[in-house]
């Protein structure tokens, strides 16, 4: 997958760590906003398609594309990486304001640094424009499969981080892409200079020289990193 580090952690080189979306979003409650609601006639709705438990936000509709109902989307991690799920998944869930809809996508493809797609039932530019501003979710189960040493950000956020001595370093609160590799933003309980509790932060590069194991079943990442770094 483009943009990944290569190699194998067991050989002391940087493993190929995959990236995807920013972080999990609220999956069960819809909060109203001032941006309006998706036009009920804009996309074909299947009442049986309820909001999935493993829905992950992967992008947003930013504009119409052409005159035949296509939409242009911004993928949260860039079309070459975050766009992979937008290209593969044919079932999308859209949220605009407080309203949620299901859309079956008939076609999707890369277009420059964006993704363009055609939701079934979107017949013209006006219909597509009605979807502008909608957040796009897909099922986690519809993400493309990764190699054994690749990971999606959404699966890493929330994992505990410990060093090789077993010292707890905190929990992954977010992932950052610095253009070269991913970085774990690890939060941990700390005490401020005034003696009050605060949230401390560690930034640990997600590369093989520091990351020694990702144990998803155990809910943790093992790193070569000291607590006083």
Curated annotation (Swiss-Prot):
Q: Which UniProt keywords apply?
A: Chaperone, Cytoplasm, Ribosome biogenesis, rRNA processing
User: What does the UniProt record say this protein does?
Assistant: An accessory protein needed during the final step in the assembly of 30S ribosomal subunit, possibly for assembly of the head region. Essential for efficient processing of 16S rRNA. May be needed both before and after RbfA during the maturation of 16S rRNA. It has affinity for free ribosomal 30S subunits but not for 70S ribosomes.
Return the InterPro entries for the record.
Answer: PRC_barrel-like_sf, PRC_RimM, RimM, RimM_N, RimM_N_sf, Transl_B-barrel_sf
Q: Where in the cell is it found?
A: Cytoplasm
**Which residues belong to any copy of the PRC barrel domain?**
148-229
According to UniProt, the name of this protein is Ribosome maturation factor RimM
Q: What is known of its domains?
A: The PRC barrel domain binds ribosomal protein uS19.
| Subunit details | Binds ribosomal protein uS19.
């Amino acid at each position: 997958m483009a943009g990944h580090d290569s190699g194998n952690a067991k050989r002391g080189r940087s493993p190929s760590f995959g990236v995807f979306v920013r972080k999990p979003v609220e999956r069960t409650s819809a909060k109203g906003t001032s941006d309006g609601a998706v036009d009920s006639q804009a996309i074909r709705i299947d009442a049986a398609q309820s909001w999935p438990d493993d829905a992950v936000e992967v992008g947003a509709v930013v504009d119409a594309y052409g005159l035949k109902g296509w939409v242009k989307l911004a993928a949260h991690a860039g079309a070459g990486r975050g766009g992979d799920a937008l290209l593969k998944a044919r079932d999308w869930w859209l949220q605009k304001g407080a309203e949620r809809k299901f859309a079956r996508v008939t076609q999707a493809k890369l277009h420059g640094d964006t993704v363009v797609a055609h939701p079934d039932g979107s017949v013209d530019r006006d219909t597509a424009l009605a979807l502008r501003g909608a957040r796009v979710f897909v099922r986690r189960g519809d993400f493309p499969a990764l190699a054994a040493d690749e990971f999606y950000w959404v699966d890493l956020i929330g994992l505990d981080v410990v060093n090789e001595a077993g010292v707890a370093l905190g929990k992954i609160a977010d992932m950052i892409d610095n253009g070269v590799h991913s970085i774990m933003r690890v939060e941990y309980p700390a005490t401020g200079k005034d003696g009050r509790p605060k949230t401390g932060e560690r930034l640990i590069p997600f590369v093989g020289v520091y990351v020694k194991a990702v144990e998803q079943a155990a809910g943790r990442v093992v790193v070569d990193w000291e607590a006083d770094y």
